[in-house]
C-alpha cells in the first residue's frame, strides 16, 4: 500500500550509481562513526576454539573503543560470550560504546564482507558487493559463503543506511584503498584473479570502481604480499595515510620472495 511517503531503499537505487549521486569513498584517516568487527569462531580459521584469537580480538576492541564506537557482530552461539566481554571492557575503563549484535556469518573478516561506506559530505550510504570467499569455486578459501554474502545488507538495514547493490561484481573491502580525494589503489593479482570477475577486463573493472567509489583515478599495483591467500589484497602491502602519502610494506633482502613484489 502506498502511504504517500517516499522512501529510498536499496531497490530504488539499484540502478543508480554512487558517483551519479555525488558519493565517494572516504579515506580511512577521515573522521568516522565507528568500526565493525565479527567475533571469531570458525574452526577452520581459528585453532583451539579460537581462544588465542579471542584474546587478540579483545585487545583490538579495547584499543578501538578508546577513540570510537565498536559494532561487534556475534553468532547466536557466541553472543553471550561477546556481550560479557563488552560489558567487562566497559566496566574496567572509560570507553566508547561497544554495541554487540547477533549476526550469522561464515567467518570473522568484517573488513572484507562488510559494506563499503561512501559519503556525499552529508549522508553516509553503504555498498554491497558480491562476496565469494576470496575466489569462489576457482580458489576460494571455503566452500560456503552465503552468510558472509548477506552481512553487508543486513548491517546497513539494521543501522538504517541506504545501500547500493553492486552485485554481481565481486569485491572485498581489503582489496581497495582510497585517499579520500578521488584516487583508489588495488592490486592486479587480486582484482584480475580468475575467481572474482573473470568476464570483465581491467578497463571495465576500473570503470566499475570509478562508478561505485566516486574515484577519478585507479592505481593498479601489480602484486601484494607474497603468499597472501586473498590473492594479495592491497591493504596488506600499501595504504594511504593521507592524499599523496602512503605506507608500504617492503624488504631490502634480495633473497626474500617479497623483494620483487614490492
Q: Model regions: which residues?
A:
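The feature marks the mature, well-folded catalytic cores of soluble enzymes
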Residues: 2-262
Amino acid at each position: 500500500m502506498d502511504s504517500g511517503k517516499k522512501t529510498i531503499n536499496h531497490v530504488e537505487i539499484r540502478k543508480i550509481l554512487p558517483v551519479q549521486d555525488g558519493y565517494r569513498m572516504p579515506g580511512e584517516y577521515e573522521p568516522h562513526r565507528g568500526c565493525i568487527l565479527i567475533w571469531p569462531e570458525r574452526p577452520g580459521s581459528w585453532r583451539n576454539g579460537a581462544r588465542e584469537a579471542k584474546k587478540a580480538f579483545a585487545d583490538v576492541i579495547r584499543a578501538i573503543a578508546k577513540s570510537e564506537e565498536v559494532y561487534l557482530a556475534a553468532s547466536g552461539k557466541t553472543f553471550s560470550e561477546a556481550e560479557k566481554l563488552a560489558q567487562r571492557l566497559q566496566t574496567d575503563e572509560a570507553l566508547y560504546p561497544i554495541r554487540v549484535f547477533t549476526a550469522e556469518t561464515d567467518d570473522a573478516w568484517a573488513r572484507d564482507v562488510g559494506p563499503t561506506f561512501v559519503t556525499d559530505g552529508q549522508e553516509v550510504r553503504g555498498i554491497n558487493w558480491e562476496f565469494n570467499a576470496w575466489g569462489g569455486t576457482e580458489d576460494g578459501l571455503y566452500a560456503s559463503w552465503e552468510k558472509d554474502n548477506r552481512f553487508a545488507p543486513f548491517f546497513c538495514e539494521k543501522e538504517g543506511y541506504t545501500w547500493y547493490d553492486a552485485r554481481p561484481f565481486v569485491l572485498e573491502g581489503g582489496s581497495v584503498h582510497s585517499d579520500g580525494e578521488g584516487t583508489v589503489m588495488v592490486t592486479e593479482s587480486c582484482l584480475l584473479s580468475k575467481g572474482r570477475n573473470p568476464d570483465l577486463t581491467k578497463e571495465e573493472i576500473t570503470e566499475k570502481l570509478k562508478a561505485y567509489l566516486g574515484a577519478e583515478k585507479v592505481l593498479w599495483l601489480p602484486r601484494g604480499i607474497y603468499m597472501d591467500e586473498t590473492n594479495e589484497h592491497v591493504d596488506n602491502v600499501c595504504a594511504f595515510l593521507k592524499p599523496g602519502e602512503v605506507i608500504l610494506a617492503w624488504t631490502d633482502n634480495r633473497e626474500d620472495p617479497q623483494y620483487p613484489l614490492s
